[in-house]
Amino acid sequence: MLHILNKPPHSEAAAQMLSTVTEGDSILLIEDGVQALLYVDWPGWNAKADVNVCVLKEDAVARGLSEVAFRHHATLVDMKGFVELTEQHTKILSWY
C-alpha cells in the first residue's frame, strides 16, 4: 500500500497513518509532510523494517529541506517518481 501524507509529522493524521503501515508499504511525504525531515526522532523513520519512505522533491526543495533527506535514508522522488509509486501499489491511502 502507498500511504501519502500531507500533514505535519506530529499530526493526528501522521499518527493514524503510522498505526496502519505494514511491511512492504511505502510512505510518500508531500506538502507539510516533508517537515518530518526536521525530526530525527519521527517514528516514521523506523516504522517497520521493510517500509520505503519517499519525499516529494519539489516540496522538500520549496521548504529548503532537500539536503537533509539523506540523513533519514529517505528517497527523494520527483513528480514522475510519484506517478511510478502509484503504479507500483494497487492500493493508495491519502492522509489529509
Model-identified regions with their sequence ranges:
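Short, basic, glycine/proline-bearing loop/turn elements
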Residues: 1-3, 24-31, 66-68
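Short, glycine-rich nucleotide/cofactor-binding loops
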Residues: 2-14, 31-36
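Histidine-anchored nucleotide/phosphate-binding helix
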Residues: 9-22, 27
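Short, conserved loop/helix-junction motifs that constitute active-site signature segments
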Residues: 19-23, 42-50
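Secreted/extracellular ectodomain signature
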Residues: 23, 32-33, 37-39, 77-80
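Short internal beta-strands
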Residues: 25-32, 51-59
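Conserved phosphate/oxyanion-binding catalytic-loop motifs
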Residues: 59-65
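C-terminal structural segments of small proteins and small subunits
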Residues: 65-96
